[in-house]
Amino acid sequence: DFRLKLLFEEIQELATAALDIEELNDKDDRYGLMQNLLKEMCDVVYVIKGMAVSFGMDFDGAFKLVHKSNMSKLPLIKDADGKVMKGLNYEPPILEGLVH
């Protein structure tokens, strides 16, 4: 699928941009690299939003609900590996009506 191939390419570019910052020794170059990282993040979101539109999905509406669901995990409970666990207040997102 074209969009999936494009998404993988954009994720690779995002990973490269993030690694460039981690490997940076000169703070003078950091601002430009941070701008590039932000651009690559936006490219990934752009492709994902395009994919959602092509499938008739309300990405922005779903994102808000998933964010609300993720915030319901508070207070944070982490497992031994540091992964955030679903706490007592967790509510899964209900995405009904967001796929057309």
Q: Which residues make up each language-model segment?
A:
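Flexible "arm" and connector segments at domain edges
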Residues: 1-100
